[in-house]
From Swiss-Prot:
<feature type="zinc finger region" description="C2H2-type 5; degenerate">
    <location>
        <begin position="527"/>
        <end position="547"/>
    </location>
</feature>
<keyword id="KW-0238">DNA-binding</keyword>
<keyword id="KW-0479">Metal-binding</keyword>
<feature type="zinc finger region" description="C2H2-type 6">
    <location>
        <begin position="549"/>
        <end position="572"/>
    </location>
</feature>
<keyword id="KW-0863">Zinc-finger</keyword>
<feature type="zinc finger region" description="C2H2-type 2; degenerate">
    <location>
        <begin position="108"/>
        <end position="130"/>
    </location>
</feature>
<keyword id="KW-0677">Repeat</keyword>
<feature type="zinc finger region" description="C2H2-type 7">
    <location>
        <begin position="650"/>
        <end position="673"/>
    </location>
</feature>
<feature type="DNA-binding region" description="Homeobox">
    <location>
        <begin position="795"/>
        <end position="854"/>
    </location>
</feature>
<keyword id="KW-0539">Nucleus</keyword>
<dbReference type="InterPro" id="IPR045762">
    <property type="entry name" value="ADNP_Znf"/>
</dbReference>
<feature type="zinc finger region" description="C2H2-type 4">
    <location>
        <begin position="219"/>
        <end position="244"/>
    </location>
</feature>
<keyword id="KW-0371">Homeobox</keyword>
<keyword id="KW-0804">Transcription</keyword>
<dbReference type="InterPro" id="IPR038861">
    <property type="entry name" value="ADNP/ADNP2"/>
</dbReference>
<feature type="zinc finger region" description="C2H2-type 8; degenerate">
    <location>
        <begin position="688"/>
        <end position="712"/>
    </location>
</feature>
<dbReference type="InterPro" id="IPR013087">
    <property type="entry name" value="Znf_C2H2_type"/>
</dbReference>
Amino acid sequence: MYQIPVKNLTKLRRPRKRVKSILCDIGMQQCQDMLETYKCFDAGDASFDNTEWDDFTDGHVGKKKKKYPYRSQSLCCSLCWYSSRSVPTFRSHIHRCHWKNLDGACLLMCPYCPFVSSPKVTEQHIQFFHMLPSRAHQSHPSHTLAHTPKTISVTVSADAADDRYTCATCGYHDSLLYVMKKHVLVNHFATLLDRYFGLGSESAPMAGPQIRDGTPVKYHCKLCKLPAETIEHLLYHILSSEKHKELHWQIMPCIIEKECMNQMVGLQNLLNLAPKSMQPVTLFARPNYMPQQTQQTNGNGTVLLAGPSNAAALFCSPGAGQMFLSPQTQALLSGTTVAALQNAPHPQSPGGMSQVLPTSPVVKPLNMVMPNMPQNTPKTLPLTMTVPRLPPPQQGPQVLLPPGVQVNLPGEMGVHSPFLVTQGLQLNQSVPRAPLITSQSVRFIPTGNKVNGVPTYTLAPVQVTVPVHGGPPQMVLAQNQISQPPNSAVVTPGLMPPVQRAMNKNSRPNELAVQAPFLKKHDNQTVKCLRCKILLTEQGIFQHLLHGLKCLFCPQMFYSFKQIMEHSKKEHSLKVKDNRLYIKEQFSLDCDDEGNLIFSTFNLNTDVPKDLLDNRELNLALVTSTKDKIYIKMYPDKAEYTTMLKSAPNACPFCQVKLQNPEDYELHLQTKHHIVPTIHAILKTPAYKCIYCFGVYTEKSTPKTISIHVQRCRCAPKAVKEAERKLNPDTSESHDGDVCSSVQMPASEVTFQGAPEFPKPKKEAVTPRNRRRNTKASKTGTLVPETPVTLVLEPMGMERTSFEDRKDFLSQYFHRKPYVTKTEIELLASRLWINKADVKAHFNSKLTKCLKAIQKKRVCVRLGFKMIEVNKLKHNLFIPEVKPVKRKDPNEVNLSSLVPGVTVKTEQVDATTQHPLFIPEVPVTIKKEEEVCEIDHGFIIQEVTVKQEEVDEMEDALCTNG
């Protein structure tokens, strides 16, 4: 812990075991040298035996502390031999095996360096090496996996109500988890991002210049060396890849979900249209806004508040005679007009008439119809307010409030929610000091825009009851029927843009031209998705556009219509002549002089949720990889694009069990099916994920496929696996890995209630080329019948053994049959529950080792024969049986071996006796000629029969040698 953090720790861990063994050898050698040095001072064993001393090992049990072998992984369990590189895998191991001692097995990773230790030690390590003096007082919620921030930002705005996630450090909020993770990683974990983010220049010296599609790669991932064309690609890979799953658990502590935000100050007071009378008005604003001074009602005067510094609203108070002008309004008016507005007297009419608010003609007028009611009778009048939508460059809201009304206005950032105004509106009836009573809660509608990452909202239509006195039988308050009082301040209409121009600009559809390389145009009404390999319909095409839209001018990819529209307007505006010429030459897209795309016709018309299209129509021109153009007209639908489950189903889609509430539904899925409902990260469709390994199932999974996955899941507990094997035994014969493929089933059995249902895609058109291909495939299928495959070794019961045992079985199978067919590999993979790629790689590695060994080593084969078996063969060869010769002492002279024993006739004895080389010691047997037999002796020639003629020749030879 007290060592300075070292970089390139992965390279140091590889030779660490070897270095440790070398140091042990060096230490042993030093001990031996020291023993030799002091050997002369040794008094002997007698002195050692006669020495007495106290045993210092008293109390030692004799058991040595268990020392685990060296583990090269970064996360090592201190309670057993287990080690892992992935944080989720290590966490699941602790929960499965050491759930009774979680505190002792808990580890914590340093967010700045690869240091890993217990939480207390890691906190000290961070304070010693990574804590800057200027940031010593700040809290670090990213240092622990289960840390809850002590202080929460109290600056809450109305747009945070629909956002599910909030940053615990800076208060940034969004409804998408990916956006929040990206924000935390880029803004609060810059050091951690540097471990993954790499430029193309950094990877060039290591792996050479990386070139992809003819262009050099700009970015890459430092850990897995994945190249990326843009920063968005690299960030998406870092945050969503399973290889970097440990990054998720370091970022999530900085993200607070909506359930954790219920204690934030001001969340329950987002907007209150009916406060109690005679109460001070409070204003909750963001840090860059200061709370304004509040006023109470005096008589029948109107209580109005000064808005934020950037709100384009004109407020007046008749009782106090004060008027507040926003900076934007002051900029539009001259200096004399501003002084006249601020200093002008505002007398109150006897009948309780409110002051006239001259407003901008940007907003539609408000028509109020007063029903007929008796005189002097307080009644409630339902008042429906419709909120029009303003584009960002237009002026902000202007508010007219009748006397006796108090409003709490939350401060907002950027584009503000437009409130109801009318041009020169007067209320000629007397209004008592009674509060407004809202008949329903306030609801916000997202506009689709974001300012500094903060989404903007507008008010939904609200019904309120206004206590008024009776008046004429029917009174219609409209713009053309309202007269202005003589002492009212009126803004010159020439200073404001015309209403018609603003309405035309707001109602004009957006235009966009992008590349969609994954689409293929079949005809004018048919489009095929090459990635999903299906034909697309009009209603479901926008789901496939989320695969990624590429800019026409740069290689950036986008996964949202709003993002690519904003990028195109800022970076590649078609108002520039060069950009118009470029798309006309490269993609044959026509534009007018103002930079608007020309759409002569549309191939497809579809409805898209309005929160995806900025609540405006979109004319989309898609350019495919073959430069074909697809023109689509997109209409904003009323239904919002749901990013989360709005209504949980009350029946399980797998076992049809009726449930009462969403909590029981999720608990049932977790306990019985081991899954939880989720949303697909890219397609934004309902899906399920495993509670052990977080793997996402397709929406057409069955209970059988889920059970098989749980049996093979490496993160699932053993008890759960055994229970699933008993309930649903795996009898399938074709699996492609640990996660089995989902079986197709009707969509009605799995889809959620309330989820969008899309019509089935059309069948692919049959062309002559496809027909020839199909007929050719059918012919080949009939000519080649499938033959049953027999395995050399039967893997009976091996699928439930360990992975090493199954590899040993594959090695034995290789020794029996090194060259296997494709069908054998598939059968072995299905029988052993191993991936086909792993089986094939195992056989290839074994074969490669054998071939290399044959090339390097010279093999000598010695052939031997069994003589017993050879003698049984029938042949014409004569193979004599030779007895082995006994070796004798060379110093001992055996005379019998010099001259062999000779058998002669009786009449030849005298002649033999007179021979000069006759040796008397040689035994001579004299027998009759008919009784002459063979005599054995120790000479090399074992059996000799000598005739008289041969004896004479022998004598001559002996004489010659002598």
